[in-house]
């Protein structure tokens, strides 16, 4: 990775003082929290659970999907996931594979198919669909790489691959493979190669110092 790209995707790095607190928290949830708050500690976790609907949904999505046993705790997390799914307008099933560092900018009308795969440090905004195509050569669901920003109203469908460090502009329709380090915009969409495509859009990314 070039120096400019490394700077783009790790603009805000945690201090050494935050690292011990991050290590005492589930690493995936710590990365999600850092994407929202720029810090990781339990007071910040509580504050964002109480006041940030997007993070609250993400938290219980993680907890419910991480529980593999049929326990009362798993049932509790699934109930809360289902409650916030309907309350905030998300359609992201527990079987959906989403990497650490998820950031949902605004709650409402966010649809991600259960067979879609999202990488680390992705941004989702309201009014987006990441869905399935039911026929043709691209029958299936998208696989999306790391550090991908999906703009308002964008639609990503079919068995396609979106590379790392890609910005998908608002209202774009994407049903084809997208190479890494690109901007995609329009309907029909076109690809603009750009090394620092997500600079200023993918921020507050935790590094290995925080076990994320």
Where are these regions (language model features)?
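Conserved beta-strand-loop-alpha-helix hinge in the C-terminal portion
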Residues: 182-184, 188-202
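Left-handed beta-helix
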Residues: 88, 94, 99-100, 105-114, ...
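A generic structural signal for ordered alpha-helices
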Residues: 37-45, 62, 70, 76, ...
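Terminal amphipathic alpha-helical/low-complexity segments used for targeting or macromolecular assembly
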Residues: 1-88, 199-212
């Amino acid at each position: 990775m070039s120096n400019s790209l490394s700077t783009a995707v790790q603009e805000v790095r945690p201090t050494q003082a935050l690292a011990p607190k991050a290590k005492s928290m589930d690493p995936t949830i710590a990365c999600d929290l850092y994407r929202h708050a720029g810090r990781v500690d339990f007071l910040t976790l509580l504050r964002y659970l109480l006041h940030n609907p997007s993070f609250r949904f993400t938290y219980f999505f993680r907890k419910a999907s991480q529980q593999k046993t049929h326990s009362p705790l798993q049932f509790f997390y699934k109930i809360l996931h289902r409650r916030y799914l309907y309350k905030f307008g998300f359609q992201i099933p527990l079987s959906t594979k989403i990497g650490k560092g998820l950031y949902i900018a605004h709650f409402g009308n966010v649809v991600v198919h259960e067979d879609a795969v999202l990488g680390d440090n992705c941004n989702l905004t309201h009014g987006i669909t990441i869905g399935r195509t039911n026929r043709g050569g691209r029958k299936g669901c998208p696989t999306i790489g790391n550090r991908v920003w999906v703009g308002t109203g964008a639609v990503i469908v079919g068995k396609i691959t979106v590379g790392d460090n890609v910005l998908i502009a608002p209202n774009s329709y994407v049903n084809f493979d997208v190479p890494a380090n690109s901007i995609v915009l329009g309907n029909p969409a076109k690809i603009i190669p750009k090394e620092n495509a997500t600079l200023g859009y993918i921020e507050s990314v935790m590094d290995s110092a925080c076990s994320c």
